[in-house]
Regions:
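Local sequence-structure signature of Cys/Sec-based thiol-disulfide redox active-site neighborhoods
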Residues: 15-43
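Thiol-based oxidoreductase modules, predominantly thioredoxin-like and allied folds used
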Residues: 50-61
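N-terminal amphipathic/basic-hydrophobic helices that include classical n-h-c signal peptides
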Residues: 1-13
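Short helix-capping segments at alpha-helix termini
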Residues: 45-49
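Short Fe-S-cluster ligation motifs
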Residues: 59-72
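A short, hydrophobic beta-strand/beta-hairpin element that forms part of a small beta-sheet core
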Residues: 72-80
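Non-catalytic, surface beta->alpha helical segment in thiol-disulfide oxidoreductase systems
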Residues: 79-97
Length: 97
């Protein structure tokens, strides 16, 4: 009960899930900067606040053309936030916004 109203448990869970950020790392095999970016994100200490997806740019000609020389590229909720390196403090700030 909140303020005299009963809030179904599933609504609380749905709100929690919908407030998580969706992070995508565009990368390719053998990219050491991609490995560093992924490790930085995974070790940022806020993994409960986002879902992480890694996309190999070699699997899509358009992504390969777009990001060939700029990986890793990291997006948060569809907005490009980082190229080449991830600033951990800025990443954490963006996840908590």
């Amino acid at each position: 009960m909140v303020g005299g109203l009963f809030i179904p448990f599933f609504l609380i869970i749905m709100q929690e899930v919908s407030s998580r950020r969706h992070v995508i790392i565009y990368s390719r095999p053998g990219c050491h900067l991609c490995d560093e970016a992924k490790a930085t994100i995974q070790n940022a200490g806020c993994s409960d606040r986002f879902s992480l997806e890694e996309i190999n740019i070699e699997s899509d000609d358009e992504l390969l053309r777009k990001y060939k020389y700029d990986i890793p590229v990291v997006t948060i909720d569809g907005v490009e936030r980082f190229r080449h390196r991830v600033n951990v403090a800025e990443f954490i700030r963006l996840i908590h916004v």
